Regions:
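HEAT/HEAT-like alpha-solenoid repeats
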Residues: 1-8, 26, 33-50, 72-91, ...
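Eukaryotic N-terminal, low-complexity and coiled-coil-prone scaffolding/targeting segments
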Residues: 1-23, 29, 33-39, 50-58, ...
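Extended amphipathic alpha-helical scaffold segments
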Residues: 148-192
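HEAT-repeat alpha-solenoid elements in large eukaryotic scaffold proteins
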Residues: 13-27, 42, 53-59, 74, ...
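Acidic, Ser/Thr- and Gly/Pro-rich intrinsically disordered linkers and low-complexity segments
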Residues: 2-4, 114-140, 180-198, 219-228
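Intrinsically disordered, low-complexity regions enriched in proline, serine, glycine
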Residues: 17-18, 36, 59, 78, ...
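Extended HEAT/HEAT-like alpha-solenoid repeat tracts in very large eukaryotic scaffold/adaptor proteins
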Residues: 19-23, 62, 134-152, 169, ...
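Alpha-solenoid repeat junctions
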Residues: 27-31, 70, 100-103, 153, ...
């Protein structure tokens, strides 16, 4: 299987086309027969293929192949994607949105929600390990998961699932906001966020999640009361939490 996927990087159109057809057929019919230890390599090769082309048809093929592989091996594929590169990379954003729009969207959101919850518990239990690894590396995983979660939520068709997962999403994201307030992040990790405040990514994720669950009038009220700005400000964080709890 790996040798076939590697041939996708071939510059000869006929060879690449044949490899694409074979790969989709194999993944659709025999994807479950792929050993899990091979999945990370396949994901890496497919992602390399995606980044190397701007051709619409070829990019559609890669996204379809990732979907088929995720259908057979959801957890290994998600883990590989989360470790692939910067989550704000435009190609990675396209991958997450493609999966979010697919029939796997609900399953993927459930998995990402659980991963965010587990990441929060893990970081709380292993403060000494965090110091050894460095704050930037320790902070990377929750941010990567949250970036992926935001892309999936933004395109997910079923709002009811977001509502059902809210009891897990809300405390998980709030915990990350609380833990990151006041931290001095390394530039490589700080660049993952568009704003200056360390917790801005998680606050934006909270706003996005609640936008899929609440009526517009409640969202407008939260904005008017300054809930999001308060959450991201260390001295006003508790006020922001109280506004959400009302």
């Amino acid at each position: 299987m790996s040798s076939i996927v590697e041939s996708l990087l071939c510059t000869r159109p006929v060879c690449a086309w044949a490899a694409e057809r074979w790969t989709l057929t194999f993944l659709g019919d025999c994807g479950e027969q792929i050993f899990q230890e091979e999945v990370p390599k396949l994901v890496h090769l497919l992602y390399t293929c995606l980044r190397s082309t701007r051709q619409s048809a070829r990019r559609c093929f890669v996204l379809r192949a990732v979907f088929l592989l995720a259908h057979s091996h959801p957890q290994p594929v998600l883990d590989s994607l989360l470790q692939a590169c910067l989550p704000t990379d435009s190609d990675m954003v396209e991958v997450w949105r493609s999966l979010g729009r697919s029939v796997l969207g609900c399953q993927i959101l459930v998995c990402l929600t659980e991963k965010l919850r587990a990441a929060g518990k893990s970081s709380h239990r292993s403060e000494c390990c965090t110091r050894e690894l460095g704050s930037s590396q320790a902070a990377l995983e929750p941010r990567t998961i949250t970036h992926a979660l935001c892309e999936v939520v933004s395109v997910l068709q079923r709002k009811t699932l977001v509502q059902r997962l809210l009891p897990s999403l809300l405390p998980g994201l709030l915990r990350q906001v609380s833990e990151t307030l006041g931290e001095e992040l390394a530039p490589s990790v700080g660049d993952l966020e568009s704003a200056d405040m360390p917790g801005s990514l998680f606050v934006a994720a909270l706003e996005l999640v609640l936008a899929r669950c609440l009526d517009n009038r409640w969202l407008r009220l939260l904005r008017e009361q300054g809930a999001w700005a308060s959450l991201a400000e260390p001295r006003a964080h508790s006020t922001g939490v109280c506004l959400l709890a009302r």
